[in-house]
């Protein structure tokens, strides 16, 4: 344990914080190209077929990105925008695709929480 005078000479160094989204590199979003679009199963105790895309980003990183919402139009070579945000029951998936931007269509017939899924306000009759 250091003495007070040692701490005065050289204060304690704070541990550098490790990023949870290293591929974004201090950007809010990044653009990329889908290299593979597939479904995968979540960890126990959940059960589903989660839609995931493998994306090669403009900075060279290749990451797995979750495609939220019901139904999507993504396929190989689609250009997508990804943001941070992990999926707790899918190990290794630390990014989300942004719906309604670039080649990703918004969710059809979405009435509530539309902004998160890139859905336009429906025309009221």
Curated annotation (Swiss-Prot):
SUPFAM superfamilies in the cross-refs: Nucleic acid-binding proteins (SSF50249)
Gene Ontology annotations of biological process type: translation
Molecular function in Gene Ontology: rRNA binding; structural constituent of ribosome; tRNA binding
Keyword match Translocase: no
Summary of subunit composition and partner proteins: Part of the 30S ribosomal subunit. Contacts proteins S8 and S17. May interact with IF1 in the 30S initiation complex.
Annotated segments matching region Disordered: 1-30, 103-125
InterPro entries hit by this protein: NA-bd_OB-fold, Ribosomal_uS12, Ribosomal_uS12_bac
Gene3D superfamilies on file: Nucleic acid-binding proteins (2.40.50.140)
GO cellular component: small ribosomal subunit
Coiled-coil blocks: none
Family statement drawn from the similarity comment of this UniProt entry: Belongs to the universal ribosomal protein uS12 family.
Compositional bias of kind Basic residues: 9-18, 113-125
Classification via NCBIfam families: rpsL_bact
Residue positions, PTM 3-methylthioaspartic acid: 89
Function: With S4 and S5 plays an important role in translational accuracy.
PROSITE patterns: RIBOSOMAL_S12
Alphabetical keyword list: Methylation, Ribonucleoprotein, Ribosomal protein, RNA-binding, rRNA-binding, tRNA-binding
Protein's recorded name: Small ribosomal subunit protein uS12
